[in-house]
């Protein structure tokens, strides 16, 4: 049974009865046999979520796709088989001849006949191309598809004639005929181009500003290639890289910016993203066209780093810029070193900006006086410590930590056997606003604990 279905299907293909088609209207077109929708799927949210809107065309009638529901075609072929004479070798040769006939011969003949009516000089051909672009644009706005096709052939004839009577190599390099005509017809930077023109302009959708580059697509003046670039790097976009490519075609009664606006709104609903930090830093260093850099308000080309105080070329002697990836326990020390170096660097820069007459030599701090002997009548320290007790550091095990004396800490854990406690700094947490506009914790002292001996702490009274 399956072999019979395959034979009937192959005979229909050989006879030219069966071929693949596309679904033009997903909501109304139904199968001729079963009556179901040819494409019973909703609008996809991402690429290839559902099968493509294809169907089978048999004797001019549309049926369900053969891969999804092959019974429809099989039932129709059983009731309407292919005549045997349609599958003879002679019929196959006629079908092959019809399919192998070069479809470009008629078009080349039309283009050659049309080119014979065009001017011979370069300036005249450029003017013809510009007029054809304007005619295509008006035809699209007036929904005159046939007029747009005629104007498109006139544009192609100008390219064909300027290229020496052939399309071969007409877009090979920047000096080729098609590239020369595209530059001549290009729209003014910042102005929305017409259909058939190349150019770039600024689009805005729900607060998202987009630099739109428009180039010619594949298929004539009514196809277009949109290149979307992020303008404000700290805001949402339709791609994590700050760039998105999209091919589209003209729609009757709509301008280029209206089509781009619809595409951007659809992409923003389905793929709203913030830029990746690496791509944001890369784009922040790239220059913008003059017309785009002068818009109001100006483009926000901020880096992903919240605070970037690096100036490697201006570091004074004794400082060096280091990028490092460290474990968490070592990164804590590196951050403390960086904070100390940042403060010293800021002081050095401020001193360098002072007039020479106002500079003051640094005052050498006086040596700390020796600690007085402990007073025997002083209040005794508590015999035990407990979690949550606020204590003051009174001594350290090495002079390098002398600046820690007097700092207050909060005890979290106790080890009576070793007469040690674990405590964190008595400081409030710090917060900041990240590039996504969210409040995040920048520093929490409770996450960093140190070990102290009983004799190093005193209860803060």
Swiss-Prot record:
Annotated Basic residues bias: 91-101
Biased composition (Basic and acidic residues): 357-377
GO molecular function terms noted in the UniProt entry: DNA binding
Superkingdom to which the source organism belongs: Bacteria
Induction annotation: Expression is decreased in the presence of KorA and KorC.
Keywords associated with the record: DNA-binding, Plasmid, Transcription, Transcription regulation
Keyword Methyltransferase: no
Keyword Manganese included in the entry's annotation: no
Chain positions covered by the region annotation Disordered: 84-107, 349-379
Domain remarks in the Swiss-Prot or TrEMBL record: Contains a DNA-binding region joined by a short variable segment to a region similar to E.coli korA and trbA.
Protein name per the record: Protein KlcB
């Amino acid at each position: 049974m399956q072999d019979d279905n395959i034979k009937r299907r192959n005979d229909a293909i050989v006879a030219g009865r069966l071929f693949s088609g596309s679904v033009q209207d997903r909501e109304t077109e139904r199968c001729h046999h079963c009556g179901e929708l040819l494409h019973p799927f909703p609008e996809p949210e991402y690429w290839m979520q559902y099968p493509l809107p294809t169907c089978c065309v048999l004797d001019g009638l549309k049926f369900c796709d053969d891969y999804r529901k092959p019974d429809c075609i099989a039932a129709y072929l059983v009731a309407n088989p292919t005549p045997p004479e349609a599958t003879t070798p002679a019929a196959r040769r006629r079908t092959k001849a019809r399919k192998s006939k070069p479809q470009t011969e008629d078009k080349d003949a039309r283009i050659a006949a049309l080119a014979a009516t065009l001017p011979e000089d370069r300036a005249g051909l450029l003017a013809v191309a510009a007029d054809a672009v304007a005619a295509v644009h008006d035809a699209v706005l007036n929904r005159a598809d046939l007029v747009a096709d005629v104007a498109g052939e006139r544009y192609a004839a100008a390219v064909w004639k300027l290229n020496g009577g052939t399309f071969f190599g007409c877009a090979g390099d920047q000096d080729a005929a098609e590239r020369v005509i595209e530059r001549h017809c290009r729209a003014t930077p910042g102005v929305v181009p017409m259909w058939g023109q190349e150019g770039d302009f600024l689009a805005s959708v729900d607060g998202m500003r987009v630099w739109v580059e428009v180039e010619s697509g594949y298929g004539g003046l009514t196809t277009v290639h949109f290149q979307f670039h992020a303008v404000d790097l700290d805001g949402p976009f339709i791609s994590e890289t700050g760039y998105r490519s999209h091919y589209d075609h003209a729609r009757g009664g709509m301008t280029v910016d209206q089509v781009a606006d619809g595409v951007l709104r659809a992409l923003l609903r389905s793929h709203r993203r913030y830029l990746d930090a690496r791509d944001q830093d890369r784009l922040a260093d790239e220059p913008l066209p003059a017309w785009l850099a002068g818009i109001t308000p100006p483009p926000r080309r901020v880096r992903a780093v919240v605070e970037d105080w690096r100036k490697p070329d201006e570091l004074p002697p004794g400082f060096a810029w280091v990028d490092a990836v460290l474990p968490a326990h070592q990164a804590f020390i590196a951050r403390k070193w960086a904070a100390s170096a940042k403060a010293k660097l800021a002081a050095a820069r401020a001193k360098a900006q002072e007039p020479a007459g106002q500079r003051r030599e640094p005052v050498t701090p006086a040596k700390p006086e020796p600690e007085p002997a402990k007073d025997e009548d002083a209040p005794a320290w508590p015999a035990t410590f407990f979690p949550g007790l606020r204590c003051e550091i009174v001594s350290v095990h090495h002079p390098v930590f002398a600046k820690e004396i007097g700092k207050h800490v909060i005890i979290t854990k106790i080890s009576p056997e070793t007469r040690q406690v674990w405590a964190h700094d008595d400081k409030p947490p710090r917060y900041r606003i990240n590039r996504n506009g969210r409040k995040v914790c920048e520093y929490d002292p409770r996450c960093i604990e140190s070990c102290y001996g009983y004799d190093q702490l005193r209860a803060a009274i």
